Amino acid sequence: MARPNAADVRSLSDSDINEQIDGLRRELFQLRFQQATRQLANTHRFKEARIKLAQLMTVQSERQRSTAS
């Protein structure tokens, strides 16, 4: 999973961002579950998912702040 740059994330619609955030949260839950049961082989997926989630949430909060002003 390649990390998107900021321009790619900002070009997404609000609904796409929300869908991706939900998907990444589910993925992180599954990764934690796999790690707890010792089934996880690729631990680097944690970092990738967290970084992508942070990027999406940052853009989402920027949009919320700009509409509130």
From Swiss-Prot:
GO process annotations (BP): translation
SUPFAM superfamilies from the UniProt entry: Ribosomal protein L29 (L29p)
Keyword field contains Ribosomal protein: yes
Pfam families reported for this sequence: Ribosomal_L29
Keyword Ribonucleoprotein: yes
InterPro entries linked to this entry: Ribosomal_protein_uL29, Ribosomal_uL29, Ribosomal_uL29_sf
Superkingdom of this protein's organism: Bacteria
GO CC, alphabetical: cytosolic large ribosomal subunit
Signal peptide interval: none
Entry-linked Gene3D superfamilies: 1.10.287.310
Protein name, entry field: Large ribosomal subunit protein uL29
Taxonomy of the source species: Bacteria, Bacillati, Cyanobacteriota, Cyanophyceae, Synechococcales
